């Protein structure tokens, strides 16, 4: 990728901050409250946005929140129950391998594909941020879901990643 000069960065006035936690979830799990790594990550995000970043989050600022939920390659046998804790998703848009697609996960559908599991992991992050990161209550937030399904099995592939892009960050 071409390197960007500092001038470009200042022109764009974008702050881009990425947070990541690995080995977040038990196999088949999607509840972020049951994952120590995920909850540590959520606390780091909350502290950052209510601390250092709060000065960039004036009312009406646009913030893009790109949340990537990942699943490993372990096949889902049968169906994992979904309790609806993060809402019901019908034709929810998401990106996988750079392509826009859509996905449905409801209490009645349950979870039969790793993509659905990965989406719910991302949805848990979305839910936490909306409920707990108070400084994002007055900004215009655009959430985007990305889903990754690894070709390998293992805890390190069951993870979440959150990227925040604050537009016009340096304008008062």
What is the meaning of each model-derived region?
Residues 70-171:
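Periplasmic OmpA-like peptidoglycan-binding domain that tethers envelope proteins to the cell wall
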Residues 15-31, 104-109:
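Acidic/histidine-rich, surface-exposed loop or edge segments in extracytoplasmic proteins
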Residues 25, 29-97, 126-130:
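Periplasmic peptidoglycan-binding/anchoring modules of Gram-negative envelope and division proteins
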Residues 1-10:
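Single conserved hydrophobic/aromatic residue that forms the stacking wall/gate
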